[in-house]
């Protein structure tokens, strides 16, 4: 559905940045007000990322007003906060389709708009990309400006400081806007974030650099920022920060909700040479009281009525796999104080809220720093502690070298609880868990498990927790569990052993993960045998050998990339056994899977029971 734009009369005049720049500056405050209201109504009617965008309305307006986008390059980090940017860059009438199949992408996406100069989804990439573009702009000598916008949460990632260190050394013209809202998806931790908060709480003192003198000219008095400062700030000050040591000219902090102050500051900063950092203070969820009070809970929302000031109540039902993990974690921690669990800033999403509250001394949020999180777990394991790393499949990619070099190579008993394995849906290509089985299967010493249901998940987690001969990984999907009974008593499974769930004829279906129910449904129609393989590595070669000798065709099913996945492991094992049987691999194709509702994507990829049956029948008829 589209909105009656006449309800937003000033915003209606600014469908693109070019339109916006034609407006007088005194209208920008009204543009911001209407933009926030439009965003509120739009997300309420379609679902999506919410609180972050409410906090960047004035920043978005100021950036597109001052900079000549898309000629000037604007790079958003992660992209949760870029909904206002999408609205202001010609996509206003399509916002109701965001995150839906064939609709607008959930994040800035190069294929979607010339204003989206860099495709994003993972955090910490903006400064590196901006530096690359700044170097290119310098070589082109066309006067192009480059701006990166990054939140305080993403600033906890090491890649950001690698880029800033390089940028300071090269001294290319670029601006980094630090959007400090004291909140990423989960509460930020660490000395850096404490330092950012202290910038506004203590008495700031320093000398003002020549560049800052230019910025101060004509600047209004910055409004008092309640609860966060001891004094009125006039213009900006330059504290001796880490940013200065890295070679950046630091300016700020300033009120990120004062659009006029932002415009004047950015206008002056355009002419400054070298790398600049503008520190702005914003409030996540700005303008909508429930989101201001609970920015984590309102980070992403389903459809809701903004006038009700609450999200729709969730119906009681099956637990999610994340909740299954969280309960298991609490159950084991209650018996073992040597269990230490780590998350890279995904406490809520990984089901660890209760654990963090009940066992705070055993809980560690490593912030958005996946490499550090994995090696931190390795350090725990070296000293005899039971390390558990709760991490999304897509984010484990960022800690791959650490998984190999710091954990598997040393055969350290670290358990990886890998959430969001397979199709995740609305967040799209950057977040699908499509590759983990493929990139883990080649790592020596690593045991890999994929549960078919919540009880297997619980028992596999316990199996990994008890296993001491090396690292283990339990890989489970996003979303609700299957409804299987969870047995409270935990029993370690025999390593590398699967089970036959149905005995049939001619066709043997080897299932890996939560597609088991679909495999059994298909088997009933084909009178096929079905094995719940449980272990991707080590593969149950004895069971495979038996099934291969007793059947004419082997079918493997997994919600992972076919290339290099569990099915590839089956073919490799059959080759080693010198058994030549036709094998149909069913899984994710060799492409990046786009966004949409999980059920829609699964059906399109023919991974539901109907699609699996059709693939097998087509294979048999060839």
Curated annotation (Swiss-Prot):
Keywords: Isoprene biosynthesis, Magnesium, Metal-binding, Thiamine biosynthesis, Thiamine pyrophosphate, Transferase. Binds 1 Mg(2+) ion per subunit. GO terms for biological process: 1-deoxy-D-xylulose 5-phosphate biosynthetic process; isopentenyl diphosphate biosynthetic process, methylerythritol 4-phosphate pathway; terpenoid biosynthetic process; thiamine biosynthetic process. PANTHER family: 1-D-DEOXYXYLULOSE 5-PHOSPHATE SYNTHASE-RELATED, 1-DEOXY-D-XYLULOSE-5-PHOSPHATE SYNTHASE, CHLOROPLASTIC. Pfam families: DXP_synthase_N, Transket_pyr, Transketolase_C. SMART domains: Transket_pyr. This is 1-deoxy-D-xylulose-5-phosphate synthase. Catalyzes the acyloin condensation reaction between C atoms 2 and 3 of pyruvate and glyceraldehyde 3-phosphate to yield 1-deoxy-D-xylulose-5-phosphate (DXP). Its EC number is 2.2.1.7. Its cofactor is Mg(2+); thiamine diphosphate. Pathway: Metabolic intermediate biosynthesis; 1-deoxy-D-xylulose 5-phosphate biosynthesis; 1-deoxy-D-xylulose 5-phosphate from D-glyceraldehyde 3-phosphate and pyruvate: step 1/1. Belongs to the transketolase family. DXPS subfamily. It comes from Shewanella denitrificans (strain OS217 / ATCC BAA-1090 / DSM 15013). Mg(2+) binds at residues 152, 181. The keyword Transferase applies. Homodimer. The keyword Transferase applies. GO terms for cellular component: cytosol. GO terms for molecular function: 1-deoxy-D-xylulose-5-phosphate synthase activity; magnesium ion binding; thiamine pyrophosphate binding. Thiamine diphosphate binds at residues 80, 121-123, 153-154, 181, 288, 370. It catalyses: D-glyceraldehyde 3-phosphate + pyruvate + H(+) = 1-deoxy-D-xylulose 5-phosphate + CO2.
